[in-house]
């Protein structure tokens, strides 16, 4: 697990991702941090967050973009191998929080909103909840993600 979250010297005072630590911290290096979002409907939901404030992917240098995508792919591979989801959703929207971050979300045909987006209209209830249906402990999944990121 990474050290306690500390905003960087260039953190923007009005940026929630610069200033606040949300989610379960799994890994970080000098440029990126990874958390698991705490979402009862989507327990296998991770974010790759730029540690420095940058709004657009194209603002990164080529090696930084490659590193970011390497981290996204490492998480995606773990989710596919361990959970066999119906689909992995990848997104970097930034309309609400203009700080570069990628969402990596395991989706299943049984999840509450499938095939809609995670913010879409609920399609069904999930008996027992999504975590029970996931079939893997979050601690084990988080450990596998952190290990893959350490090797990425």
Language model: regions and residue ranges:
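HIT superfamily nucleotide-processing domains
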Residues: 1-152
């Amino acid at each position: 697990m990474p050290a306690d979250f500390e905003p960087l010297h260039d953190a923007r005072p009005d940026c929630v991702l610069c200033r606040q630590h949300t989610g379960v911290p799994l890994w970080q290096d000098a440029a990126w941090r990874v958390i698991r979002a705490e979402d009862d409907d989507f327990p296998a939901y991770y974010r790759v967050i730029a540690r420095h404030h940058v709004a657009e992917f194209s603002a990164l240098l080529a090696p930084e973009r490659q590193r970011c995508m390497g981290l996204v792919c490492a998480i995606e591979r773990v989710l596919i191998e361990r959970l066999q989801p119906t689909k992995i959703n990848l997104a970097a929207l930034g309309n609400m929080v203009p700080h570069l971050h990628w969402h990596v979300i395991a989706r299943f045909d049984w999840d509450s909103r499938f095939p809609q987006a995670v913010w879409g209209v609920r399609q069904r209830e999930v008996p027992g909840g999504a975590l029970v249906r996931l079939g893997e402990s979050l601690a084990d999944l988080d450990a596998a993600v952190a290990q893959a990121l350490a090797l990425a």
